[in-house]
């Protein structure tokens, strides 16, 4: 029911008109008997107020004679979360026992004595107070000269116990002790009734009635008011004390704005002024401040009955205050402006004309309002103000009943009041005991939270069931359907918590930290049912207390009203099997004050509505009804933004429709549609028919004197796409998918989104195919894992659908599937290495056809890290091999057989030489069978050569010798040839020494040559000597001597020394040459001598000395790359030509002997 109270007030500036919207959340309880519902109509100047109130009734209870109305105004709405919750140590100590008698169901006509619980947990409101400007700086405001009679008649409604709400007349009398004008506010109030009949409003005449004589109108003229302002003050005060909860008062209709829970208070003050930015509390003089609890009779704050704490303060503002200066108002730490919503923004302070004096901000942590003055204080002087602020017990800081000393302060000046905090009792009938309150209202999400205590008295309850209804319940626990329903279904959040035996529930009926209780919600998964907007929880037999937290949705009315009600009931069986019921209902009551202006009736402002339809546009053409499969979309969130930036949201119904009401003409609004999950907005303005097109996700509309029901929008399901293709074995390694190349199964493929987050993993099927589904448009990354035994093939060689894309590739989805992401692999090839170990009998490091392999030589293979990966032995032919090797670096280690010696290394081609004891080898895409090694047995050579040559020559000759000596010495290595003779000697010495391994050679040559020549000759000698020496590692000495002499000497010296390895050779050569002898000496010494003279002397000396000794050289143990060659030693094992020199000297001595002999003979011939 909506009661509209219109009042008029006169100030120095003339008539004013203000409005206050208030919301009260109420609660009432029912037993099995009658139900008493109490509603409190809040009247005052300010804005909206939300209160949680409850009424309790039992069948044997008595009812109060009447309820009283409080004049209240909203200050702020936000719960202060900075304080900590006190531990709940006080048990639920009270109960209202409602055991019924059969006759108790009859309605009683006598007044009852039952305690009525009107629990208000709500947003606060403030009374606009009069601020009087005594000395105003030049102003053009004029006072109306026309006499205005404002007459209000107040009639007392008869007391009727069948009515939910009764009223009683005000008994206050006019006072002349203070000068004050109170602007009144037009207020609209909505009382949501229950099962009880409502009182009949009394007829109200448009008169001002004296408070002390309700039936006699008091006519007051403007002139009287000017002369006696106190009279006006009393009239307004009496009017504000009048109970309007059940008596609508006729008033001039004014505009009623959409009602919202956020506070918009108005404080009546004198007039504005301006500049500064510092705190001026010392320039604020507090003239009066009081704290009033509820009706002020007992200072009991019945927190669940909607009893508020009213703080009144009157103060003056010093003329030194400038624009930007600030002042503070402090709440007590145990109260909050609102315990239902989170909106605590204080209202601006304005004067009766609406001009802003100061703007306020609220600090949740300190519970302090800071007002910043505007330039109003620069324009006006002697400003007086009175504020009335409402607050409520903070259930977080005061969880249980207690006594408090509340302290409020204006500009640092404090006042205090002792208060007793009282909380509700559980409703009890038999073993059924239950209580509940609304605890949180969220207008943005359109949800209401309710907390229910089940069995708070911890009785032993049998067959316990609890109903949560989206409407009120009657006294038998039955559901009362009607207006004010919430939505109770499977989407309703219902949490159940068990209270341990050692835990006490806070009496505040509000839990802030549920973690301290055991969450047993899951135990009710199969014990919870829904039917007809009711949830039923089956608790069975219990003896513990439980807490139920319910968060339900509601749908505001088209004109923005919060028409919300929700009930709960508990039923148990007694020992006879009869049910006992106890129940509570919580609901919101909306009140709205309006005020008249200037004594004339102002026509009520007409309000308008907007809205229409949201549908699924299957064919995406942006036009409604073009496809038979198109259908309305329910539960789409639609948000309306008002011109001041505030918002309101509603969801589309089952038919896709939505609607917003209470909109003003000429104002511009914005409607936004939330895109549902999995959908995309359709085409905008697809037709010229505004009733059939889609207006998009956001549309702005201006009200032009009529409703606009053409704001539609369409959505279509967001398409999903696939990505993937193929992994195959690229047998020919060309990176192209050929028809005969098979797929590879079980290859792991990973999909990542554009941020690198893994969103899917799969493996290829038996044919090598893979696919990722349900993907949106966008960029993706696909990673292929290389399967064991395979190598990735070349990539990007041809078209996308036939090539290989690499191990990591990017795929783009743009309104179509992408099935082109392929990857090819080929089987990784394996290789072998090895070859041969042989007995190198001739120690030359080369594999000869006659040399045999060595069996059972251990060969070890290491990888690049030095890890042994294989060991084998050579077979009977000396062969070995390692197989199944990948390309890479390896080391082959040969273990030297006992008694054998490593032969020389790297003497010839890789496949025929010896590579040494350790060989590094690299395999690159091919086998390697060139890793060989050879060994031989160790030997020792000792050669001792002792040569003793004694030559005695005595010659006496006179000769004329013409000697032509041509000495040609070709020496390999170091050759030292000294020839001083008239002879031709040709010496050819070939020495070949081949020594390997450890060989010890000791050669000792001792040559003793004694030549005694006595020559007396007269000789004319012409000698031409030509010596050419060429050294090339081979010594060839050729000496040719031509001698012409009368003497014929034939000397033959034969010396043969042969030394072989492993033998001791002693050579002793003794040559004796004597003149006058014919000597024919044949020496195996490659010496050729031609002599032409008077006497024929033919000396042919041929000396061939071959020393077949090997001087073994122990090779170094080296580790080298297989392809490097070591420098070869000389074949003799040494780089000198000692034996050649010995032969040369022997030949020279023989030639010298011949010359002496030849000279002697020539002398004799003469």
Curated annotation (Swiss-Prot):
GO terms for biological process: cell adhesion. The modification Pentaglycyl murein peptidoglycan amidated threonine is found at residue 1132. Coiled coil: none annotated. It is found in: Secreted, Cell wall. Residues 607-719, 720-829, 830-940 form the CNA-B domain. It is a peptidoglycan-anchor. InterPro entries: Adhesin_Fg-bd_dom_2, Adhesion_dom_sf, Fibrogen-bd_dom1, Ig-like_fold, LPXTG_anchor, SDr-like, Sdr_B, SDR_Ig. GO terms for cellular component: extracellular region. Its main location: secreted. It holds the Pfam family Big_8. Cell surface-associated calcium-binding protein which plays an important role in adhesion and pathogenesis. Contributes to the resistance to killing by innate immune components in blood and thus attenuates bacterial clearance by interacting with host complement factor H/CFAH and modulating its activity. Also inhibits bacterial opsonization and killing by interacting with host complement regulator C4BPA and thus inhibiting classical complement pathway activation. Interacts with host complement factor H/CFAH (via C-terminus). Interacts with host complement regulator C4BPA. This is Serine-aspartate repeat-containing protein E. The gene is sdrE.
């Amino acid at each position: 029911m909506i009661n509209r109270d219109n009042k008029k007030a006169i100030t120095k500036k003339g008539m004013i008109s203000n409005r206050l919207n208030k919301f009260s959340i109420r609660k009432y309880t029912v037993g099995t008997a009658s139900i008493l519902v109490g509603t409190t109509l809040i009247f005052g100047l300010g804005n909206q107020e939300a209160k949680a109130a409850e009424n309790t009734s039992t069948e044997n209870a008595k009812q109060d004679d009447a309820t009283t109305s409080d004049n209240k105004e909203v200050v702020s709405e936000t719960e202060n979360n900075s304080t900590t919750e006190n531990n709940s140590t006080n048990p639920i100590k009270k109960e209202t026992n409602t055991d019924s008698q059969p006759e108790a169901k009859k309605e009683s006509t006598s007044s009852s004595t039952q305690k009525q619980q009107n629990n208000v947990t709500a947003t606060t409101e403030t009374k606009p107070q009069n601020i009087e400007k005594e000395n105003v700086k030049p102003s053009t405001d004029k006072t109306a000269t026309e006499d205005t009679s404002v007459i209000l008649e107040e009639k007392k409604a008869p007391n009727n116990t069948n009515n939910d709400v009764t009223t009683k007349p005000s008994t206050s009398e006019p006072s002349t002790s203070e000068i004050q004008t109170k602007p009144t506010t037009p207020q609209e109030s909505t009382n949501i009734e229950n099962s009880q009949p409502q009182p009949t409003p009394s007829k109200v005449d448009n008169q001002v009635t004296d408070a002390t004589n309700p039936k006699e109108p008091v006519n007051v003229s403007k002139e009287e008011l000017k002369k006696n302002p106190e009279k006006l003050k009393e009239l307004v005060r009496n009017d504000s004390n009048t109970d309007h909860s059940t008596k609508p008062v006729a008033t001039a209709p004014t505009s009623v704005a959409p009602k919202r829970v956020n506070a918009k208070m108005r404080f009546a003050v004198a007039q504005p002024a301006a500049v500064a930015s510092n705190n001026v509390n010392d320039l604020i003089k507090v003239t009066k401040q009081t704290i009033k609890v509820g009706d002020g009779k007992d200072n009991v704050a019945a927190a669940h009955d909607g009893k508020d704490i009213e703080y009144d303060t009157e103060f003056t503002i010093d003329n030194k205050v400038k624009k930007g200066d600030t002042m503070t108002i402090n709440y007590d730490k145990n109260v909050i402006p609102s315990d239902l919503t989170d909106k605590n923004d204080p209202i601006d302070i304005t004067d009766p004309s609406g001009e802003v004096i100061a703007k306020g901000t609220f600090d949740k942590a300190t519970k302090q309002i800071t007002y910043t003055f505007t330039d109003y204080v620069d324009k006006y002087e002697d400003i007086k103000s009175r504020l009335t602020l409402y607050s409520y017990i903070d259930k977080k800081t005061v969880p249980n009943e207690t006594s408090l000393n509340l302290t409020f302060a204006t500009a640092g000046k404090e006042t205090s009041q002792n208060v007793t905090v009282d909380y509700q009792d559980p409703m009890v009938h038999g073993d059924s005991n239950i209580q509940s309150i609304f605890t949180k209202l969220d207008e943005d999400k359109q949800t209401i939270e309710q907390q229910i205590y089940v069995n708070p008295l911890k009785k032993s309850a049998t067959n316990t069931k609890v109903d949560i209804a989206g409407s009120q319940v009657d006294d038998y626990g039955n559901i009362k359907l009607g207006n004010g329903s919430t939505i109770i279904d499977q989407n309703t959040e219902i949490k159940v918590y068990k209270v341990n035996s050692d835990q006490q529930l806070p009496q505040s009926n509000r839990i802030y930290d549920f973690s301290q209780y055991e969450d047993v919600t899951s135990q009710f998964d199969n014990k919870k049912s829904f039917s007809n907007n009711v949830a039923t929880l089956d608790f069975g037999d219990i003896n513990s207390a439980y807490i139920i937290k319910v968060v339900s949705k509601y749908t505001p009315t088209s004109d923005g009203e919060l028409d919300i009600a929700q009930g709960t009931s508990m039923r148990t069986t007694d020992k006879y099997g009869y049910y006992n019921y106890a129940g509570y209902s919580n609901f919101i009551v909306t009140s709205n004050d309006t005020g008249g202006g200037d004594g004339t009736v102002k026509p009520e402002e007409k309000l308008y509505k907007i809205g229409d339809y949201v549908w699924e546009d299957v064919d995406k053409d942006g036009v409604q009804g073009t496809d038979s499969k198109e259908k309305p979309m329910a539960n789409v969130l639609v948000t309306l933004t008002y011109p001041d930036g505030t918002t309101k949201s509603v969801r589309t119904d089952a038919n896709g429709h939505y609607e917003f009401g209470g909109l003003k003409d000429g104002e511009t609004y914005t409607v936004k549609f939330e895109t549902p999950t999995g959908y995309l907005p359709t085409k905008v303005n697809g037709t010229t028919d505004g009733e059939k097109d889609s207006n998009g996700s956001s549309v702005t509309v201006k009200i032009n004197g009529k409703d606009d029901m053409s704001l539609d929008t369409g959505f279509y399901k967001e398409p999903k796409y696939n990505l993937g293709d193929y992994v195959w074995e690229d047998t020919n390694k060309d990176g192209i998918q050929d028809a005969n190349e098979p797929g590879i199964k079980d290859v792991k493929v990973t999909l990542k989104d554009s941020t690198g987050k893994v969103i899917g993993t799969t493996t290829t099927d038996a044919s090598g195919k893979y696919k990722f589904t349900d993907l949106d448009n966008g960029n993706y990354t696909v990673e292929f894992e290389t399967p064991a035994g395979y190598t990735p093939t070349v990539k990007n060689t041809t078209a996308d659908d036939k090539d290989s894309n690499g191990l990591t590739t990017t795929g783009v989805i743009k309104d179509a599937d992408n099935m082109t992401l392929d990857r090819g692999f080929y089987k990784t090839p394996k290789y072998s290495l090895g070859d041969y170990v042989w007995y190198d009998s001739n120690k030359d490091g080369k594999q000869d056809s006659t040399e045999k392999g060595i069996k059972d030589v251990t060969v070890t293979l290491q990888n690049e890290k030095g890890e042994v990966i294989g060991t084998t032995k050579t077979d009977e032919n000396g062969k070995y091999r390692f197989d199944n090797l990948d390309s890479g670096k390896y080391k082959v280690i040969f273990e030297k057989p006992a008694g054998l010696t490593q032969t020389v290394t790297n003497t010839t081609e890789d496949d025929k030489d010896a590579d040494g004891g350790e060989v590094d080898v690299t395999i690159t895409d091919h086998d390697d069978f060139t890793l060989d090694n050879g060994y031989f047995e160790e030997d020792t050579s000792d050669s001792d050569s002792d040569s003793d040559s004694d030559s005695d020559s005595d010659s006496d000759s006179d000769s004329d010798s013409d000697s032509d000596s041509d000495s040609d010495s070709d020496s390999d290595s170091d050759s030292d040839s000294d020839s001083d003779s008239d002879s031709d000697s040709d010496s050819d010495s070939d020495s070949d020494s081949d020594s390997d391994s450890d060989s010890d050679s000791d050669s000792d040559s001792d040559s003793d040559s004694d030549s005694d020549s006595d020559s007396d000759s007269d000789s004319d000698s012409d000698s031409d000597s030509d010596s050419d020496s060429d050294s090339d590692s081979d010594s060839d000495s050729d000496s040719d001597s031509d001698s012409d002499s009368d003497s014929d000497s034939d000397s033959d010296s034969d010396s043969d020394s042969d030394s072989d390895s492993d033998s001791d050779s002693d050579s002793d050569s003794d040559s004796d040459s004597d003149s006058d002898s014919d000597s024919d000496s044949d020496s195996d010494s490659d010496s050729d001598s031609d002599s032409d003279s008077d006497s024929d002397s033919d000396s042919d000396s041929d000396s061939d000395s071959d020393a077949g000794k090997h001087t073994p050289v122990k090779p170094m143990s080296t580790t080298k790359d297989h392809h490097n060659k070591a420098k070869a030693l000389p074949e003799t094992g040494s780089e000198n030509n000692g034996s050649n020199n010995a032969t040369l000297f022997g030949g020279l001595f023989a030639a010298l002997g011949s010359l002496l002999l030849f000279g002697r003979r020539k002398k004799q011939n003469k």
